């Protein structure tokens, strides 16, 4: 189908988003076309603002508009425990259950030799540096329960063994092959409670 150039560019832009194919992108573009101009401008401003003002916390790697993030700044949090997750969305999922009160470390990925992602490509070195500076007694590995997440957890566990820091893995109330961000609060809570030492 041939669309006018501005509409075609919008469709192409929507297709850059994960899970958006040509039909959905066209449907979204036509929806934008039907919206009031002030609503479209507000939407465009929100996109620009997110890109300009949201960045990663220099301590934990979570998304934030301040540095450090609100979690790292919160003195009431348990600074003896760090929960290691793959993605900022996992922090949001863990926070939703309102049971974990420690700190986080976001790896921004998982070890995946098939995709050419090694330990040096994710934030493992930053975790090791952080563990030297803080009084951490336990590291909870909450990577996804899939091959990449397990490989990452085992790799970090082996690295931390000589440090004397207790290393635990969240229990698998989570489905194998699933993503942490999609788990409900009860499942996440039970997985955290049932964590095991590695």
From Swiss-Prot:
Keywords: DNA damage, DNA recombination, DNA repair, Metal-binding, Zinc, Zinc-finger. It holds the Pfam family RecR_C. Residues 80-175 form the Toprim domain. A zinc finger (C4-type) spans 57-72. The keyword DNA damage applies. The keyword DNA repair applies. GO terms for biological process: DNA recombination; DNA repair. One of its GO terms (molecular function) is DNA binding. May play a role in DNA repair. It seems to be involved in an RecBC-independent recombinational process of DNA repair. It may act with RecF and RecO. Belongs to the RecR family. This is Recombination protein RecR. The gene is recR.
């Amino acid at each position: 189908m041939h669309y006018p150039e501005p509409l075609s560019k919008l469709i192409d832009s929507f297709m850059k988003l994960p899970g958006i194919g040509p039909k959905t992108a066209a449907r979204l573009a036509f929806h934008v076309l039907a919206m009031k101009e002030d609503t479209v401008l507000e939407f465009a401003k929100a996109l620009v603002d997110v890109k300009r003002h949201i960045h990663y916390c220099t301590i934990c790697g979570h998304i934030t508009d301040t540095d450090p993030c609100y979690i790292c700044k919160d003195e009431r949090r348990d600074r003896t425990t760090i929960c290691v997750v793959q993605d900022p969305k996992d922090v949001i999922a863990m926070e939703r259950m309102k049971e974990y009160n420690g700190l986080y470390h976001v790896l921004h990925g998982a070890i995946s030799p098939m995709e050419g992602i090694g330990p040096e490509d994710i934030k493992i070195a930053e975790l090791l540096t952080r563990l030297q500076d803080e009084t951490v007694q336990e590291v909870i590995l909450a990577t996804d329960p899939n091959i990449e997440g397990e490989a990452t957890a085992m790799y970090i566990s082996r690295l931390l063994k000589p440090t004397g820091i207790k290393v635990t893995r969240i229990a698998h109330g989570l489905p194998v092959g699933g993503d942490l961000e999609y788990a409900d609060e009860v499942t996440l809570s039970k997985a955290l409670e049932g964590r095991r030492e590695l």
